[in-house]
Amino acid sequence: MEVNILAFIATALFILVPTAFLLIIYVKTESQNKK
């Protein structure tokens, strides 16, 4: 079974992008709460 590189990249982006977005929001919220 051949691995589709584009499909793998698309899946990785689909998972990583929202995760990074939520992580950034979490860090910003934490930094605001600590002040």
From Swiss-Prot:
InterPro entries per the UniProt record, alphabetical: PSII_PsbM, PSII_PsbM_sf
Keyword Thylakoid: yes
Transmembrane helix is among the record's keywords: yes
GO annotation, cellular component aspect: chloroplast thylakoid membrane; photosystem II
TM stretches of this protein: 5-25
Pfam family, one: PsbM
GO biological process: photosynthesis, light reaction
Subcellular location: Plastid, Chloroplast thylakoid membrane
Topology in the lipid bilayer: Single-pass membrane protein
Keywords assigned: Chloroplast, Membrane, Photosynthesis, Photosystem II, Plastid, Reaction center, Thylakoid, Transmembrane, Transmembrane helix
Oligomeric and partner information: PSII is composed of 1 copy each of membrane proteins PsbA, PsbB, PsbC, PsbD, PsbE, PsbF, PsbH, PsbI, PsbJ, PsbK, PsbL, PsbM, PsbT, PsbX, PsbY, PsbZ, Psb30/Ycf12, at least 3 peripheral proteins of the oxygen-evolving complex and a large number of cofactors. It forms dimeric complexes.
Summary of the function given for this chain in its UniProt record: One of the components of the core complex of photosystem II (PSII). PSII is a light-driven water:plastoquinone oxidoreductase that uses light energy to abstract electrons from H(2)O, generating O(2) and a proton gradient subsequently used for ATP formation. It consists of a core antenna complex that captures photons, and an electron transfer chain that converts photonic excitation into a charge separation. This subunit is found at the monomer-monomer interface.
Family, as annotated: Belongs to the PsbM family.
PANTHER family: PHOTOSYSTEM II REACTION CENTER PROTEIN M
Name of the featured protein: Photosystem II reaction center protein M
Originating gene: psbM
